[in-house]
Amino acid sequence: MASQIRHNYHEDCEPINKQINLEFYASYVYMSMGHYFDRDDISLPGASKFFKDSSDEEREHGQKLMKYQNKRGARIVLQAIAAPSLQEWGNLHDALQAALDLENEVNQSLLDLDATASKINDPHLTNMLEGEFLEEQVESIEKIGNLITRLKRAGTSGLGEFLFDKELKQRFLPSLTSHPN
């Protein structure tokens, strides 16, 4: 059955379904990282919370794109979500570097989609991508890059990593730090 509301939504914009998949994949990767750092033998609660929050954010992005597809009268075509390439994330520096690489991949995919929307003259899609995704993506890349720099200064393992995680915990888990056991 054809959509009654689809208007000026070119079929070349259907790759938005691939972006939905990429956002859910990113959520899946961050969820894996969050639970990895929550393990009893790793125990970095600040990192765990940071990555779990990142997972929630990426899932929300996927859902926002799904709502947009429906709003424009397009069809949502969900694809299988690939498993993360790693199950063991190493130290926090390694995980943050993987997160930065992932954010850059998501950003490039959004830029490609934005270029397609501009090429086929779809101002609605261009406006949505530029207003709701691209700026936030640049901020995420900057945030993770800054975290990597600060972690390198503190030391990427041992006491430096522990102290850095303590700072993350204070930023992302204020209720745990305000009531010491």
Curated annotation (Swiss-Prot):
Gene3D superfamilies: 1.20.1260.10. Fe cation 2 binds at E58, E103, Q137. Residues 6-155 form the Ferritin-like diiron domain. One of its GO terms (molecular function) is ferrous iron binding. Keywords: Cytoplasm, Iron, Iron storage, Metal-binding, Oxidoreductase. CDD domains: Euk_Ferritin (cd01056). It holds the Pfam family Ferritin. It comes from the Eukaryota. Transmembrane segments: none annotated. It catalyses: 4 Fe(2+) + O2 + 4 H(+) = 4 Fe(3+) + 2 H2O. It is found in: Cytoplasm. There are 2 types of crayfish ferritin subunit: a 19 kDa chain and a 20 kDa chain. Belongs to the ferritin family. Stores iron in a soluble, non-toxic, readily available form. Important for iron homeostasis. Has ferroxidase activity. Iron is taken up in the ferrous form and deposited as ferric hydroxides after oxidation. This is Ferritin.
